[in-house]
Regions:
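Class I S-adenosyl-L-methionine-dependent methyltransferase module
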Residues: 162, 168-285, 324-359, 363
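Conserved Class I SAM-dependent methyltransferase catalytic core
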Residues: 355-409
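DNA major-groove recognition helix of helix-turn-helix/homeodomain DNA-binding modules
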Residues: 26, 43-60
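A short, Lys/Arg-rich alpha-helix, primarily the initiator
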Residues: 1-13
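Interfacial/linker helices and their anchor residues that mediate assembly or domain coupling
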Residues: 65-104
Length: 430
C-alpha cells in the first residue's frame, strides 16, 4: 500500500474531509489531493504534521514514503528482488536506521526506536536535549517519569551518571528490562531459543489462547498460532531463564510481531481487510546493560513522592486515549493471565487506567508537579487541545500547563516548529 493510499484510508477512517484537514493542519487541499492520489510525496514536515493530527507514528509514515521512493527508482531495473536483497545486505546500522532495513541484514539486531507507539518522541529527542543542555547544569540524576518507548531514557543513559525510568504498562516494563536491565544473560542461550522458535511449523501447532482470540484479526492465523505457542513456551521455560533472559525473549517477540500487526500502529482496532500471511522469523533486539539505571512500574504521582532527581522529564498522555487499552494485546501477551476478552477489538477488562486521560488531568498534573523534588523539570506538550476528534482533544490546556508550572519555578517555553503544536517547557524550580 502506497503512502498516499495509507493517508487517504486513515483520513477516511477518522471521518475528515480534505478541506477539514487543510483548515486543521495548514496543508493546502490541492497538495493533500496530490499526495493521496500518488502524484507527489509528502515532505518531512507534512508527514510530521499529519502524523500528529491523526495521532499515528510519523516514523512509520516515513518508512512508507521512503519505500515508495525506492520502488520508484528500481521499477525499470531488471532483477529487482535480487537488487533489493543485495542492497539490504550492504546497509549498515548508522544511528537511528530504519528497522525495515535493519531486519533484513543478517545478524542485525532490532533497535529500541523501531516499535510503533503513539506519541513517540524519537524525532524530537535531539531537539529536546539540546534545549535541556542549554538551560540546565549540574545534572547527576535524571528521571523519565512517563517513559513510554524509552527513547528519552536511552538518551539520558548516555548523558547522566544516574537515571530513573518509570511506566505503568507491563509490556513497557518488560521491554525496559530487556533493552537496559543490568542482570545477567546468555546470548548463546537466547540465540538457541530463537533458532528453535524459527524452525517451528505452524501447521503442526494446535490452536491456542492467542490464535483463538487474535488470529484472523490482528495477525494471520498461522502467525497467531506461532505467537501463542512461543509465549507459552517462554512461560514454561521461566525457571531456566534469568530475569533479563525472560524479558529479552518477550521483548523480542513483541518487536518482531509489531511491524506486521494488522493495525495502524495500535490495537484499538484491526484493519478489516484480508491479512496477507507472512512468516515469523524472530531477530534479537538490541540488548544493552546499564548499571546506572533504576526501572520502576508505579503510578507516576506516587513515585514523585519518593524520588529525588536533578532533572525530571514529563510527558503524560494528554488526551482520552488510554495506553493500556491501545496496547492491550501486548499487555495480555506479557501478563499471560489469559483473561476473557470482549468486543470487536478483543480487549480484556479495563485496568491500569490513567487519570491524565480524563477530566481529572489538570488536578493530577498539578499534584505531580507539586510533589516532585527536582532542580529542573522538562515538560513536553503536544497542542491538540482544540482537535475535532474528542479522543484526541487534550484534557489540559497549554495555559493550564503554564500556570501550574509557574507555581513551581521560573518557566521557559520552546516550540519545535512554526505551527505551535509541539512545546517543551523548562522549569528551574524554586
Amino acid at each position: 500500500m502506497y503512502i498516499g493510499t495509507v493517508l487517504k484510508n486513515i483520513r477516511e477512517e477518522q471521518g475528515f474531509s480534505l478541506l477539514e484537514i487543510q483548515k486543521k493542519t495548514g496543508i493546502k487541499e490541492s497538495q493533500l489531493c496530490r499526495i493521496e492520489s500518488g502524484i507527489r510525496f509528502p515532505t518531512d514536515d507534512q508527514i510530521f504534521i499529519l502524523a500528529k493530527f491523526y495521532n499515528i507514528d510519523s516514523n512509520q509514515l516515513q518508512i512508507q514514503r521512503e519505500s515508495d521512493k525506492v520502488l520508484e527508482i528500481i521499477k525499470n531495473i531488471p532483477n529487482q528482488r535480487q537488487v533489493l536483497d543485495v542492497a539490504k545486505q550492504k546497509l549498515e546500522s548508522n544511528g537511528n536506521y530504519l528497522s525495515v532495513a535493519a531486519d533484513s541484514i543478517p545478524g542485525a539486531t532490532i533497535p529500541l526506536e523501531s516499535r510503533r507507539y503513539i506519541g513517540c518522541k524519537q524525532k524530537l529527542v535531539d531537539w529536546i536535549f539540546d534545549i535541556i543542555k542549554e538551560n540546565t547544569s549540574g545534572i547527576k540524576t535524571a528521571t523519565d517519569i512517563f517513559a513510554g518507548t524509552g527513547v528519552i531514557t536511552k538518551k539520558m543513559l548516555h548523558l547522566y551518571p544516574n537515571v530513573i525510568m518509570n511506566d505503568t504498562l507491563y509490556s513497557n516494563h518488560i521491554i525496559y528490562k530487556a533493552f537496559f536491565g543490568n542482570s545477567e544473560w546468555s546470548k548463546e542461550k537466547i540465540t538457541s531459543k530463537l533458532s528453535e522458535y524459527n524452525s517451528l511449523n505452524p501447521k503442526e501447532i494446535n490452536d491456542n489462547y492467542f490464535s483463538v482470540n487474535f488470529g484472523g484479526k490482528y495477525f494471520d492465523y498461522d502467525k497467531a498460532k506461532l505467537i501463542g505457542f512461543i509465549r507459552e513456551d517462554i512461560e514454561n521455560s521461566k525457571s531456566e531463564l534469568t530475569e533479563k533472559e525472560y524479558a529479552i525473549l518477550l521483548a523480542t517477540l513483541i518487536y518482531n510481531i509489531d511491524k506486521t500487526a494488522n493495525t495502524l500502529g495500535h490495537f484499538e482496532a484491526y484493519i478489516k481487510k484480508p491479512i496477507k500471511p507472512t512468516p515469523l522469523k524472530l531477530k534479537l533486539i538490541d540488548v544493552q546493560q546499564f548499571s546506572n539505571l533504576q526501572i520502576f512500574q508505579e503510578d507516576s504521582n506516587e513515585l514523585a513522592r519518593s524520588i529525588n532527581s536533578d532533572l525530571v522529564y514529563i510527558d503524560p498522555p494528554y488526551n482520552s486515549r488510554q495506553y493500556s487499552r491501545f496496547y492491550h494485546v501486548y499487555e495480555t501477551l506479557v501478563k499471560w493471565d489469559k483473561p476473557v476478552l470482549s468486543g470487536v477489538a478483543m480487549k480484556p477488562p479495563a485496568e491500569n487506567m490513567s487519570k491524565y486521560c480524563t477530566s481529572q488531568a489538570p488536578k493530577a498534573f498539578s499534584d505531580l508537579i507539586e510533589n516532585l523534588d527536582a532542580k529542573y523539570l522538562a515538560v513536553s506538550y503536544n497542542n491538540t487541545y482544540n482537535s475535532k476528534s474528542g479522543s484526541l482533544r487534550n484534557h489540559i490546556t497549554i495555559k493550564q500547563i503554564d500556570e501550574i508550572l509557574s507555581r513551581k519555578g521560573n518557566v521557559e517555553k520552546f516550540s519545535w516548529y512554526d505551527d505551535n503544536q509541539e512545546f517543551l517547557f523548562i522549569v528551574k524550580t524554586r
